[in-house]
Amino acid sequence: MSLMRNMNRALTATTGLQVRRAPKRQPGPVTKAPEKKTPAKRPAPEYRCTDDPATDRLLRRPVFIMSPVRSGSTLLRMLLDAHPRLHAPHELHIRRLEVDYGSTLSRRAMDALDLSRGDLEHLLWDRVLHRELTRSGKDFIVEKTPSNAFVYRRIRDCWPDARFVFLLRHPVSIAQSWHEGDPDKRTYEEACADALRYMKAVDNARKGITGGHTVRYEELTADPERRLRALCTYLGVDFEPAMLDYGARDGTQVQKGLGDWRDKIRSGTVQAGRPLPKDDEIPEVLRPMCEAWGYLK
């Protein structure tokens, strides 16, 4: 008689229970993990163009650098920030500051003041920039967030007296730098496509805004004093030699993760740009932009 039978006889006599082998469990149906849904893009709010800037805005004649990623905007803002009248902080990303209503009553109250959600956002943007400028003690603020180019109309409408600086660079150099900044995140081909979105946005802004000033990265690094003198003339300020030695100040102007903070920027002086690619080295996807910006004949 087996051990199991003896155990069951004794167990049954004392408890009335028996031990049985559990049946093999059949595998259940395979269920797929639920797909992550990308949240719907929030529609751009309506707003009115101010007809009374003296009342609606605290900021006067702000400066916006419209540039693609990796086009030298951090270098340019460091040079401008060394001017005693120009305050050029790190990227502020004001377009991502949004306003919403906590209740129907708050919406109705703002409607009664003729303030839509877009108008309230403009008031917020203006206050943030004005606060930063006031803290600096300077006269004009310079904002250089690359994604501003995607909403250039809102920025133009928010500050009717704004000045715009368009910073251009060879599209291939932009794509190479964008890829090298994080090669594990994006291939060179992906960097070309992604950077091209910013280039197109800047190109649209350049066509849609009158009276701006264009600076080319290659010319800025080759002859910084000449290009800065021309830019200062456009901005209505005197050229200051200290702009060429922006590194003489402390290092608080560089914030890791906000703009370019690599050694080339931290050197404190303008460094030579990378050699330009030959025409046959330009990827097909970038050739139209190279031609539009005068880098390909």
Language-model region placement:
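PAPS-dependent sulfotransferases, especially Golgi type II membrane carbohydrate sulfotransferases
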Residues: 1-63, 179, 203-207, 233-297
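Charged, low-complexity, helix-prone segments enriched in Lys/Glu/Asp/Gln
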Residues: 17, 118, 125-129, 194-199
